[in-house]
Amino acid sequence: MTVAAGAAKAAGAELLDYDEVVARFQPVLGLEVHVELSTATKMFCGCTTTFGGEPNTQVCPVCLGLPGSLPVLNRAAVESAIRIGLALNCEIVPWCRFARKNYFYPDMPKNYQISQYDEPIAINGYLDAPLEDGTTWRVEIERAHMEEDTGKLTHIGSETGRIHGATGSLIDYNRAGVPLIEIVTKPIVGAGARAPQIARSYVTALRDLLRALDVSDVRMDQGSMRCDANVSLKPAGTTEFGTRTETKNVNSLKSVEVAVRYEMQRQGAILASGGRITQETRHFHEAGYTSAGRTKETAEDYRYFPEPDLEPVAPSRELVERLRQTIPELPWLSRRRIQQEWGVSDEVMRDLVNAGAVELVAATVEHGASSEAARAWWGNFLAQKANEAGIGLDELAITPAQVAAVVALVDEGKLSNSLARQVVEGVLAGEGEPEQVMTARGLALVRDDSLTQAAVDEALAANPDVADKIRGGKVAAAGAIVGAVMKATRGQADAARVRELVLEACGQG
C-alpha cells in the first residue's frame, strides 16, 4: 500500500491518482508562515518568552487581557520584523499600524488579537527556493506583518488530541503575546507536479534565512515556526482560481510537502466526480492526511479596525538603513562561496543541501577539520544515524566542534575510522566529549609495538598454513593474519603497522 493510499484509508477519503491530478488540474498554493521572534519579552508587555515554563507563570494583566491594562510595543520585535523584510527583498513601508482582529476563542483572553491588517510593515518581496534538481523557484512575498501569538490549548480525554471528543480543555497563556511575524506569499501558480516540493523548499529556505538572521530559533517541533498551507485546484487551461482550503499549523518540513500533495489528491477526487470544494480550515495528521476543521472565515468576519491603544509605527529611513547593514551573508550566497572554497561539484553540493548538512559541515571545518572529513561524517555516518532516529541532522546530540574533535583524534593516530565511529556513538548516547568516550570505552589505538608484535606472533602460530603461504611469497595472504590480529585487539591495533610486522615476521618485509 502506498503512503497516499494508507493516508486515504486512515482518513476515509477518496484520492485521485497524482499523475491524473496534475494532468487535469493546476494547483495554486498560498503559504502563510508564522514565526515566533527571539525577543527577551513579549510583544506588548514585559513577560518573558522563555519556552517550557510552568503553565501560566509567564503572564501579566496585559497578556491576560485584564481590564485597564495597556499594551507597550516591543522595539526589538519591530527591528527584527524590519530585518526579516529586508532579507526577503521587501519594501519597508514608511508608516504602518496595528489592528484588532476580533474573534471569540479561549486561546486569546481579550477576544481579539493585535495584528496588522491592511497596513503591514513589509510588502512585495521574494525568496528564491532551491529545488532538488539544482534550479530555483522564485516565491513572491505579498506581505510580512507583526502580531502577537495566542495561548496554547490542550484537549484532554480525546483520542486525537483535538477538541472533538474531549472531556475538557486546559489553557496555557505563557505563549499569549509572544511576538510573531507572519510571512504571506502571493499565489504560487504554474508549479504543476512540483507544487509539494516547492512548498517544502520554500519553507526550508525561509527557515534557513531566519536562522541566519538569528531572529528566531525556528523550531517547528516546538511551534516557534508554523506553516498554514492554502491549496486550491483549477481545471487546466482556465484562469479562475478554485475554492481553497487552509491546512493549519503544519509543524515539519516533510509534513508541508505531504499536506500539499494530499490536499491536491483529495480535492482532485472531489472535482473529478463533479463535487464542490468547501472553503474550510483543515487539520494535518502525522499519518499523512488532513481532516475538516471549521468553515473558513473571511476578513469581514474578523471585523478588523485600527488598534486604538497603540500609535502607528513609522520607521525612519536611517533606522532601516542601519538595520540593512546588520543583514549577514545569506544562506544561498554562503553556500555558493563554500562550494568554491571546497571545490565540490554541483551534485555533491546539492546532496549536502538536501541533507541539511552544509552549515554543519562548514561549522565543523571552522573547528579545524578538513572539508573532506567533515563531509564524510555528516553526509554518511551521521546522516544514517539521523535517518534511523527519524530526525534532522541538526537535531542529533552532537555538535560540529565534537565532530571536529573526533577527526583530530583520527588525524593524530589515536583512533582508526572504525573506532572513531564507536566514539561518535558514545557522544550521541550522551557519554561525554570524544576524548572522554575514547578513554572510558578503552578505544584508543595500541601504539606499543611490543603488544602488537605479541598479537602478530600469536596469530601466526595459530595459523601455520597461512604463515607458510606468506613465507612462500603470497603476501596477499597477510590479510587473514591482519584480520585475526585486529579481532584479537578489538580493532585497536594500527592495521598498517600490523601488516608491516606480519610481513617482517615472515621474511617478506
UniProtKB/Swiss-Prot annotation:
Biological process according to GO: glutaminyl-tRNAGln biosynthesis via transamidation; translation
Annotated gene: gatB
Highest taxon above the source species: Bacteria
GO molecular function annotations of the record: asparaginyl-tRNA synthase (glutamine-hydrolyzing) activity; ATP binding; glutaminyl-tRNA synthase (glutamine-hydrolyzing) activity
Origin species: Mycobacterium tuberculosis (strain ATCC 25618 / H37Rv)
Keyword field: ATP-binding, Ligase, Nucleotide-binding, Protein biosynthesis
Catalyzed reactions: L-glutamyl-tRNA(Gln) + L-glutamine + ATP + H2O = L-glutaminyl-tRNA(Gln) + L-glutamate + ADP + phosphate + H(+); L-aspartyl-tRNA(Asn) + L-glutamine + ATP + H2O = L-asparaginyl-tRNA(Asn) + L-glutamate + ADP + phosphate + 2 H(+)
Entry GO CC: plasma membrane
Function: Allows the formation of correctly charged Asn-tRNA(Asn) or Gln-tRNA(Gln) through the transamidation of misacylated Asp-tRNA(Asn) or Glu-tRNA(Gln) in organisms which lack either or both of asparaginyl-tRNA or glutaminyl-tRNA synthetases. The reaction takes place in the presence of glutamine and ATP through an activated phospho-Asp-tRNA(Asn) or phospho-Glu-tRNA(Gln).
Family annotation (PROSITE patterns): GATB (PS01234)
Protein name: Aspartyl/glutamyl-tRNA(Asn/Gln) amidotransferase subunit B
Annotated signal sequence range: none
EC identifiers of the protein: 6.3.5.-
Root EC class: ligase
Record's subunit section: Heterotrimer of A, B and C subunits.
Gene3D superfamilies, alphabetized: 1.10.10.410
Protein family per UniProt: Belongs to the GatB/GatE family. GatB subfamily.
Record keyword Transmembrane present: no
